[in-house]
């Protein structure tokens, strides 16, 4: 996958290119990241990249000419088929379904805004889609862009050490992930669930699915509203609810 970055602070993306899963992907040639700074497309002595908004008001906007020139340079480098994305609070909220959708693109150009944003006409003429990582304000689009890159790169074949990892992540099937345990078997009196030590892969799969369903019901019940549960999933969720109610009753009786 090839990803182009438009940012006033391209050095921030060393967190993606130099470390962790994405860093290994870059090193192994599975992910290619290039960046363009609008500041490199300025022609004045101060390398100005901001401008006052029409109509007044606080704050500045990114200057149109350097931004457009940077986008055009990225498009030229990408060639045909690159999707241009603007990271914006007004965009579609990124979720696992959206990540999976974006991962089908071989080329992405991510435009990171600064100041109060960018000229609406640049959005209309240069941007294919707007995406947001949540209903809150950040200082720029770099962190959302890094979030998008990290999540999308997990779908690139060969990036993860275990090919099943991406499909077993939280939200991969619309559910939260199940609890995980490693050594020691007993930690401050808390034991690993016996089923995970049993070696019975069918029962382990069933336990993990039940816990995934139950955790989603407890923490993000709205996610279940969008799912058509299979007969097995519905049965396991009912079992979890019964067990949870029994545990709560026992806890209340001890209080």
From Swiss-Prot:
EC number(s) given by UniProt: 2.1.1.228
Class of enzymatic activity (EC top level): transferase
Annotated localization: Cytoplasm
Keyword match Transcription: no
Pfam families, A to Z: tRNA_m1G_MT
Domain of life the protein comes from: Bacteria
Reactions that this protein is recorded to catalyse: guanosine(37) in tRNA + S-adenosyl-L-methionine = N(1)-methylguanosine(37) in tRNA + S-adenosyl-L-homocysteine + H(+)
GO cellular component, one term: cytosol
The keyword tRNA-binding is assigned to this record: no
Molecular function per GO: tRNA (guanine(37)-N1)-methyltransferase activity
GO term, biological process aspect, one: tRNA N1-guanine methylation
Keywords associated with the record: Cytoplasm, Methyltransferase, S-adenosyl-L-methionine, Transferase, tRNA processing
Binding site residues for S-adenosyl-L-methionine: 113, 133-138
Oligomeric and partner information: Homodimer.
Protein purpose: Specifically methylates guanosine-37 in various tRNAs.
UniProt-listed PANTHER family: TRNA (GUANINE-N(1)-)-METHYLTRANSFERASE
Family: Belongs to the RNA methyltransferase TrmD family.
Name of the protein this chain belongs to: tRNA (guanine-N(1)-)-methyltransferase
Source organism of the structure: Escherichia coli O127:H6 (strain E2348/69 / EPEC)
Recorded name of the encoding gene: trmD
């Amino acid at each position: 996958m090839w990803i182009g970055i438009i940012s006033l602070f391209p050095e921030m993306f060393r967190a993606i290119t130099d470390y962790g899963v994405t860093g290994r992907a870059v090193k192994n040639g599975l992910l290619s990241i290039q960046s363009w700074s609008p500041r490199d497309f300025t022609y004045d002595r101060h390398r100005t990249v901001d401008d006052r908004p029409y109509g007044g008001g606080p704050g500045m906007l990114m200057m149109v000419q350097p931004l457009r020139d940077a986008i055009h340079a990225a498009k030229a480098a990408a060639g045909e088929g690159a999707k241009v994305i603007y990271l914006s609070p007004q965009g579609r909220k990124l979720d696992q379904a959206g990540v999976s959708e974006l991962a089908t693109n071989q080329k992405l150009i991510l435009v990171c805004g600064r100041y109060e944003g960018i000229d609406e006409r640049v959005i209309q003429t240069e941007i294919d889609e707007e995406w947001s990582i949540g209903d809150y304000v950040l200082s720029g689009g770099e962190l959302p862009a890094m979030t998008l890159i990290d999540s999308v790169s997990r779908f690139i074949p060969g990036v993860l050490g275990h090919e099943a990892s991406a499909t077993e992540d939280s939200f991969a099937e619309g559910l939260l992930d199940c609890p995980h345990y490693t050594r020691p078997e007993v930690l401050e009196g808390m034991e690993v669930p016996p089923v995970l030590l049993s070696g019975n892969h069918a029962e382990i799969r069933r336990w993990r699915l039940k816990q995934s369903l139950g955790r989603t019901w407890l923490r993000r019940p709205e996610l279940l509203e969008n799912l058509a549960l299979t007969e097995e999933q519905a049965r396991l969720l009912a079992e979890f609810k019964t067990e949870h109610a029994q545990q709560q009753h026992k806890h209340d009786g001890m209080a």
